Design a protein with these regions (language model features):
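A cross-kingdom marker for long, charged
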Residues: 140-200
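Structured, acidic catalytic/metal-binding patches in enzyme active sites
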Residues: 1-145
């Protein structure tokens, strides 16, 4: 974090202890290891814990592994520095509140995460948007920063990338939905966007 701020500086001793206990008991790691990390990044560490499958790798990793195995080139929309800048735009105190809220309501967070996965499998875009706007996810207030502006930037990149041939594009579900989601932005640019049958 900027200015030498530490994670423990953002919480009361009691709140910090609640987060520390969760990381120790549920994530099997010490919160002390993450003192310099932005709370928004720490919130992202919680999502694998909400997964019901036994896989130890993320979807991103699985896709990258497939690409490497088949000698397919990979490129990203953003650098780590660009992603960090997004979180620097949101006050650390606000990020800290969101992290605590997710941990304190972990039961509801788990339910919403499972609903999100099912809505994604069923290609129910309206349901996905409704879920990401739930206060549990802490996205709605900062949607412009976390999703909309980034989507618009990504579409400009995609217009150039797709000129080169067939591409596989993987993004988080939240980036797909809404009037400023990638689906509608691509349609506005004249692209035909349709769902494919989900075969399990």
């Amino acid at each position: 974090m900027k200015g030498g701020k530490k994670l423990k500086d953002l919480y009361s001793p009691e709140a910090y202890q609640r987060i520390s206990a969760y990381f120790k008991d549920s994530l099997k790691t010490a919160l002390a290891l993450y003192q310099n990390m932005k709370p928004g990044f720490l919130t992202a560490l919680l999502y694998p814990k909400m997964m019901t499958c036994s896989s130890t790798i993320s979807v991103d990793e699985a896709i990258m592994n497939l690409a490497h195995e088949n000698n397919i080139g990979i490129s990203g929309f953003e650098t780590m520095a660009m992603q960090a800048a997004v979180f620097d735009s949101i006050p650390y105190e606000k990020q800290a509140e969101e992290l605590l809220k997710v941990i304190d309501s972990i039961g509801n967070s788990l339910i919403q995460f499972k609903l999100m996965l099912q809505a994604y499998k069923d290609q129910q875009l309206h349901d996905i948007e409704k879920i990401i706007n739930d206060p549990v996810f802490g996205v709605e207030e900062d949607r412009d920063l976390l999703l909309d502006k980034r989507n618009k930037h990504w579409v400009e990149q995609l217009k150039e990338i797709m000129k080169k041939g067939t591409v596989f594009i993987a993004v988080g579900a939240g980036h797909l939905v809404g009037k400023n989601g990638l689906i509608e932005l691509l349609r506005a640019e004249g692209y035909t966007v349709r769902g494919l049958e989900n075969r399990e």
